[in-house]
Amino acid sequence: MKRIISSILAGLFLTAVPMVQARNLSADEARDAAIHYLQHNTFLERTTANDLVLAHQWTNPTSGEPSMYLFNHTGNGFIIMAATTAMDPIVAYSDNRQLDVERMGESLSWWLDKYNTMVCEVQDYDAAQRSSLVCSEWEALEHHALKGNTKDTRIILMEEEWDQGNNAGTTYNMYSPVVNDTTCPTGCVATALAQICHYYGYPLKAKGTVTASASDGTTLKIRKMQDSAAFNYAIMENHINYSTPIESRREMSRLAYYIGVTVGMSYAPQGSGAVSYTAIGNMNTNFKYQKGSMTYRSTVADSVYLQRLRNELMMNRPCYMGGSSKSGGVHAAGHAWVCCGYRTDNLKMYYMNWGWDGTGNAFYNLGNNNMPIPGMGYNFTEYQEIVTGLIPPQDSTSRDIYAAIPRAEGQVVLGHPYPNPATTSVMLPYSCNHSTVLAVYSIDGRQVATQTLQAGNDEVRLDVSAMPAGIYIYRAGDTYGKFVVR
């Protein structure tokens, strides 16, 4: 009898856990899966094998085999694929820009290094144990089983693409301290927070005298910021290029500089840094931003961490994120960036703004992939944090203006408005499944214009000639955007 019961239990176990062996993938296999994903989840519906060029591959130091593949799309876009079926297929993707690993900022480089370490440990894990980790998503991609296109399920809150001042043609660090005849970069913490401040249009003005410190401990006296020195958000732009007016460059640099020195940046020519916990506290002390709540990923269940992040984004609040490594090297210091988007159909994919002139801004897989595995020495969740509730004070007209805007019906995808800033009119590309109303609001929440979007793929012209200079928010369906009138 005991033997019969044991046989039945063994049969049930084998039925419940199919022993499919996880395997590593060649570049061609990964490319084929990437094509199918891009065709059904992005604006790159017509992607073919000729469109995806292998631009970089990460290598497992133990086995020497590939661990991740980066494919750049010839029509602008990229996708990073895990090189094992034991992991989620998609590491990251963009359908509007390529990725040059030689130009990545340290924050993105750090994040990809951590993710790659996780992939390598899974590849090195005992083969019999690894079989239970086979990701079911691979089956749909390898058998070309996806239907339709889910590009309409993504929401991106921010259009800002600011930088630390390191890249050619950008001058976000015009006011940063000079050390040994070199102007210091603004730093990732200040850049992340400055982009959030620009998103909200707050603080309204600079206050008092502040000092900055150099990384060698030298205290640097900086210019006085008068109470009356209001920030002119109307002339700030989402991105600096060679044609950006000098007045806009100065104002954006002034905001980044003031944010930096008041949150405690330590400036140095090779890189400026600050402690995230202290910086967030100073946002409350100096700017009256509400006290943000910091969640360390390793202290809560992964589902809790991701739900807190998603809840923040669903309230249209860009989320400050940070991370660090536990030992040495270029990544030992902290890193900071902004998470400002998500996919409504995928609880793992989130849009990251790395504060590096738009380089690498894309959707990234934040899922923990059932890690850590018992017995493994690596935990992807360590040394990561998010800050929720970092919003302007309740008496600010900027606070929760996005949440106050009523939702419109219909599935809508809005493109980037152009020109932006504008003086007479703004063109707004869109795609919607049926007739939808686009509403435009001033920064204090007043509706100033509406426009009907007809079903299909088109663009609409918004007349802004009579609108006062300032920041305006538009909404259609669940999608937001922002433009500036001068």
Specify the residue positions occupied by each region the protein language model found:
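Residue-level detector of functionally pivotal "anchor" positions at catalytic/ligand-binding pockets or at interdomain
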Residues: 377-418, 432-433, 446
